[in-house]
Regions:
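Short acidic/polar alpha-helix capping motifs at helix-coil junctions
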Residues: 14-16, 28-32, 49, 60-65
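Generic recognition of short, well-ordered alpha-helical interface segments
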Residues: 3-6, 18, 43, 47, ...
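A short gly/proline-enriched turn/hairpin at secondary-structure junctions
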Residues: 32-42, 54-58, 114
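Short, low-complexity N-terminal intrinsically disordered segments enriched in polar/charged residues
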Residues: 1-29, 119-121
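Hydrophobic pocket/interface hotspot
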Residues: 8-11, 23-24, 31, 44, ...
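A beta-strand edge to alpha-helix "cap/lid" segment located at domain peripheries
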Residues: 3, 49-121
Length: 121
């Protein structure tokens, strides 16, 4: 799990820095990525690039990992502090969310969003 956690820590740092190319390089070519704005999923690196381009044109999201754990099927579960502002700096969201990552060949293959463990405890 440690190697995957280290990769994900970098992914969060790169996302928050808007270094899209580095984040996308950590993803499998055929990644399935949760669309937290519009629902459903986007597919492939190009789908994620398009989604983030739309997202970052309207909001300024930042996500900070708080806790990492391993799920029953080997997935990495991350409890995340999510802070979202509009482009004028107005706070839109400040909450905990759950992120679930599945890896293939050392790359992120799937990303899903769920309630954080603290919300269900």
């Amino acid at each position: 799990m440690l190697d995957k956690v280290e990769v994900l820590k970098k992914v969060y740092d790169w996302f928050n820095a808007r270094d899209m190319d580095r984040v996308l390089a950590a993803m499998h070519e055929d990644v399935v990525w949760a669309n937290g704005m519009e629902g459903g999923h986007v597919y492939g690196r190009n789908g994620v690039r398009s989604y983030w381009t739309r997202q970052w044109a309207t909001i300024d999201p930042h996500v900070y990992p708080v806790e990492f754990s391993t799920g029953p099927e080997g997935e990495i579960v991350v409890e995340v502090h999510q802070v979202v502002h509009d482009l004028h700096g107005k706070l839109l969201a400040d909450k905990m969310v759950g992120h679930v990552f599945r890896f293939e060949d050392g790359l992120v293959k799937r990303f899903d969003i769920r309630e954080p463990a603290s919300a269900t405890a």
